């Protein structure tokens, strides 16, 4: 495919990804894994569309690369816009205010727009810092340190520790019933994963993952929202966001490092990493800085999880699994100073999508 045509296709699919991320991010209950599963299930339809618009891009390699750029742009945009319904929907009552998320706490004092703007700022900083740690992470996980391979034998013990720590976090005030319920949920989730991934189902991954992710990420959120009693949202104050501070940078770095951990450690999600980190903090950070951390975690995880695919040939997220399937054979990042061309395009798509989505999300929240 000629370079001008490919650049045009790259920009088109990146912008389509941003638009899709806006739609899914603003829709409560939708997850980017739903989009990933849907793209895999409808790949042939996408290929026909690309061939009709860009006849020179009919080969499977170009189609897969454009769809991967679309998916990562959607993931980055979704990570930013997902904070809008997270903050403004399901507002708690006064009786439950102390147990709510930091975004809701800011909403209850009239600073909901500020919460979204801070998360968007964290998303931009997280993307920038993720690019900074990219090469050091490559040197750490692959040669010469080869930490990913060395850590593999310790994975079972690590997962046992993570599960135990998460269960312990539910034992506040000796509420052992909470621990029992959490253990039951973890057991059911494990059995479901074994049945789907190791079972004898004749269905391909694209067909199985879409209803699975819809049930895990979509329907429960909608049912919980319908069953919850929302409180009144107070009048919101629209104030200009303060200038970038050292606390913002420090919070974004903390979030990026957490995202880097999530991107390669097996079985560790962003929520689990945040829970484990909170168990070790002597003095928790305030809600404003926590929103910056969350924004940085979301976008850095999205970017670095795909980069890790090229480093160690293992996918740690739904989007990374889809990218590996779309690219058919993502090349290994063998030379630390020579980044694979396909990875560079994916990084550019992610960075461009974040740069577009962050100011839009902050404006929509107003």
Where are these regions (language model features)?
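Helix-loop-helix hairpins and the membrane-proximal interhelical loops
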Residues: 1-62, 144-148, 199-281
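Transmembrane alpha-helix interface/packing and boundary motifs in multi-pass membrane proteins
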Residues: 17-32, 77-89, 166-170, 256-266, ...
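Short, non-helical or kinked segments that cap or interrupt transmembrane helices
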Residues: 26-38, 87-99, 268-273, 284-295, ...
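Membrane-interface alpha-helices at helix entry/exit sites of multi-pass transporters
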Residues: 50-53, 65, 102-123, 282-296
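Extracellular loop-to-transmembrane helix junctions
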Residues: 54-81
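Membrane-embedded alpha-helical segments of transport systems
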Residues: 72-81, 118-133, 291-308, 348-352
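Membrane-embedded alpha-helical modules
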Residues: 118-227, 331-366
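Membrane-interface interhelical connector segments
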Residues: 310-339
